[in-house]
Swiss-Prot record:
The keyword Signal does not apply. Belongs to the geminiviridae replication enhancer protein family. InterPro entries: Gemini_AL3 (IPR000657). GO terms for biological process: viral process. It comes from the Viruses. The keyword Acyltransferase does not apply. This is Replication enhancer protein. Increases viral DNA accumulation. Enhances infectivity and symptom expression. Homooligomer. Interacts with the replication-associated protein (REP). Interacts with host proliferating cell nuclear antigen (PCNA). Interacts with host retinoblastoma-related protein 1 (RBR1), and may thereby deregulate the host cell cycle. Oligomerization and interaction with PCNA are necessary for optimal replication enhancement. Keywords: Host-virus interaction.
Length: 134
């Protein structure tokens, strides 16, 4: 959903993509929070934020685009190591597809968390997407 207007994002807007080699450094990855075994749980909770860079947003017709993924995992990774593996694997998946869009990023994250990084229990996604109005 567009955060400014409240309108739903159409399938065409979500699938609108650009070749990955046309945009250098298309994504910015950041770990927002890492809770080590909170409340005597047997899981770590890691919140990862993916931001689209200016050139990618311009190519896709977006004003702003952030995706937050809250990951519950039974692994006990170091924060920097989890981020490095996550970023590398997401970019590797997108490079194999050749196209980067909102949908392909969600598919790449799902692939990495459930097929590459073992120990993922569940993932919650939230996003902030604002389309260009003009």
């Amino acid at each position: 959903m567009d955060s400014r207007t409240g309108e739903l994002i159409t399938a065409a807007q979500a699938m609108n993509g650009v070749f990955i080699w046309e945009v250098p450094n298309p994504l910015y990855f950041k770990i927002i929070q890492h809770d080590n075994r909170p409340f005597v749980m047997n899981q770590d909770i890691i919140t990862v934020q993916i931001r689209f860079n200016h050139n990618l947003r311009k190519a896709l017709g977006l004003h702003q685009c952030w995706m937050d993924f809250k990951v519950w995992t039974t692994l006990q990774p170091q924060t920097w190591r989890f981020l490095r593996v996550f970023k590398t694997q997401v970019l590797k998946y997108l490079d194999s597809l050749g196209v980067i869009s909102i949908n392909t990023i969600v598919k790449a994250v799902e692939h990495v968390l459930y097929n590459v990084i073992h120990g993922t229990d569940r993932v919650e996604q939230s996003n902030l997407i604002k389309l260009n109005i003009y």
